[in-house]
């Protein structure tokens, strides 16, 4: 393009064109983009470089397309006259139900293993309280306390002596093994009573003494009730004996599903023992879980009420109860999730015999936010305690796993009532003679939160709870007992060879009271979406700024500014390098300046006219070799006038 044409095009480009006065559509659009409040259109024109202009065109067209799409949806929705009807039949998943007999093992089967322990227990009762148990069952043909024990120290009472303390005589106790003589008690005396509930204190208390192996540092545990002391002492030895029995043998000694579950109905349909899964509990024997996600299916119910839940009749068999291990008759039931471990001993509900127990459920689901909103955990993976249970994480599982791990570390064996950690064995006298003392000391530290388990374990973020409402009714009634008990006996077939009474049976009904499910969900008060929305509202209110404006700010203040600073620094670096290369390498003079110049040699006297004449003459001015330019060639008035003559403005109408 000729120089004149270039100047002409530049002048046209910079002419102030106003809206409708633009000569072409292109110039009109350009004027609109330069003067509109729509930021995207303006950036299309003023952005330098083809790539940036293409990006702004893409952003603007995308935004315009979204606007048309959303507006079209709003218009169509406004003029739509159709009606939508939703019919939803709600169903709730039925929880898992675990049922256990309170008595873990049939007494007729386990009696041989516990014969010596029971004999010493009866002898201790006779010596401590001065009475003998009245035999009321022909099946229990055990030996009573006899003088043959005199002079012989029994095994169980020798390991853990039973003592009677008189509150008036501190530090002394009566041991029946010493023929009633009082002896001094060394070590700590710990009274296991509640610090909250005040009970009447009797003058005499019963307890037992635990001593570490080959040590006199003993601990004596006393109880406000002799019943608690005898049962706790019996339970310690019972766990020691059963810990040495293989699991298969213990399963055979407990109740089978056919023996415990007589009849079963769910949601109006018949069920049987095949719908229950065996779960062996160390302290409750064989337990059976209904709806335990067998075959990866979970049963659900679509109606509320007792007719649409689980109905079972349980055979308790009171005749087979261990008299010292349990003092109540009935069963225990626990409602829980399918992947949850049933802590039947802690939160189970007891079922009475000769009663119909109805349990109405109401489901509540809770969902909590994890960190940073709370200290809960999703699945326990962030808790430094290994889950020794084959179940989903819960706070209770974490606490018991922590205690069992500490038990193995401190005592060298595992406590019988909890699962075994890897490469560990249950405690027993033969291999771990010191385990009882260690267990009680460790459990006391656990209750007082000295082991650190309570500070490490976290609550689960999501869990289900069933609020239970229990009601009781006498069952069977006096008029129906005459025919109902014979029918139940006939249903049991050859398994029962005696006449049953109502205390051998219990009826259980578990159902949803209604299908209303309550959900408790936590949500953050300030989310990312809300934060961006608040920012957008403030920017739009005070600066009429949008997302396009934010992109424009990023482009100008970050990309362009950084580019300019980088360019300037690069230019300065190039100039510095050029000056360094062009500068002559001047050498420093060898002596003082002017000392070797003969023209500067002066006398010590004042200067005279003669000495001034001896100075060299000043050099003459140099004449430039290049003549000055002809300034008349720089005058552009004539050329500029000729170029403006070729530019014509449109005629006014």
Curated annotation (Swiss-Prot):
The lineage of its organism: Eukaryota, Metazoa, Chordata, Craniata, Vertebrata. Residues 137-225 are annotated as: Gating release of inhibition by proteolysis (GRIP). The gene is SCNN1G. InterPro entries: ENaC, ENaC_chordates, ENaC_CS. Disulfide bonds join 100-287, 211-218, 264-271, 376-461, 398-457, 402-453, 411-438, 413-427. This is one of the three pore-forming subunits of the heterotrimeric epithelial sodium channel (ENaC), a critical regulator of sodium balance and fluid homeostasis. ENaC operates in epithelial tissues, where it mediates the electrodiffusion of sodium ions from extracellular fluid through the apical membrane of cells, with water following osmotically. It plays a key role in maintaining sodium homeostasis through electrogenic sodium reabsorption in the kidneys. Additionally, ENaC is essential for airway surface liquid homeostasis, which is crucial for proper mucus clearance. The record marks 140-141, 184-185 as: Cleavage. Originally identified and characterized by its inhibition by the diuretic drug amiloride. One of its GO terms (cellular component) is plasma membrane. A motif (PY motif) lies at residues 627-631. This is Epithelial sodium channel subunit gamma. Pfam families: ASC. Its main location: membrane. The chain crosses the membrane at residues 56-76, 539-559. Residues 1-55, 560-653 are cytoplasmic. GO terms for molecular function: ligand-gated sodium channel activity. It catalyses: Na(+)(in) = Na(+)(out). Residues 77-538 are extracellular. Keywords: Cell membrane, Disulfide bond, Glycoprotein, Ion channel, Ion transport, Membrane, Phosphoprotein, Sodium, Sodium channel, Sodium transport, Transmembrane, Transmembrane helix, Transport, Ubl conjugation. The keyword Cell membrane applies. It comes from the Eukaryota.
